[in-house]
């Protein structure tokens, strides 16, 4: 297969997947922090379980996709599958998950929906994404460098 065609096809598939993902985030209202917070607020008596459909849809695609992946030697548009090699739940994972969950619970935003929410042009979303990026940079400069 021609290398240019292969690169163009990979780019096109990534673009289509990103467009589909972003459209789905907006359509399901995952980019609406109030909707997300009402989903996370189970104990309030005003819990909105509608985002369970988002989770259910993700699982309905992921399970067959993972079963197919186990049968394939390599993906169609890459040299290998990029799967996590770390399988241990350690203090970093637990602590990072707690920080992530705290931020998600306080703001109703997590990375994918926050980036998709940039389309709204809201200052609070711009500030959130800038702070999120700063947090990732700080992590890379402090934590990753201290481990190497």
From Swiss-Prot:
Protein name from the UniProt record: Probable transporter PD_1893
Keyword Nucleotidyltransferase: no
Protein localization: Cell inner membrane
Principal location listed in the UniProt entry: membrane
InterPro entries: DUF6691
Induction summary: Repressed by BigR.
Transmembrane stretches, start-end: 11-31, 48-68, 93-113, 118-138
Family assignment from sequence similarity: Belongs to the TsuA/YedE (TC 9.B.102) family.
Note: Probably part of an operon that comprises bigR, blh, PD_1892 and PD_1894.
């Amino acid at each position: 297969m021609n290398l240019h065609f292969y690169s163009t096809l990979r780019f096109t598939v990534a673009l289509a997947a990103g467009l589909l993902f972003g459209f789905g985030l907006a359509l399901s209202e995952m980019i609406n922090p109030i909707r997300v917070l009402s989903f996370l607020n189970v104990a309030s008596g005003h819990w909105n379980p509608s985002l369970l459909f988002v989770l259910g849809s993700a699982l309905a695609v992921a399970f067959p996709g993972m079963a197919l992946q186990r049968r394939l030697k390599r993906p169609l548009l890459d040299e290998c599958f990029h799967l996590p090699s770390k399988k241990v739940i350690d203090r970093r994972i637990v602590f990072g998950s707690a920080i992530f969950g705290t931020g998600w619970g306080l703001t109703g935003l997590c990375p994918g929906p926050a980036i998709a929410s940039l389309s709204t042009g809201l200052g609070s979303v711009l500030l959130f994404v800038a702070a999120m990026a700063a947090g990732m940079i700080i992590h890379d400069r402090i934590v990753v460098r201290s481990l190497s």
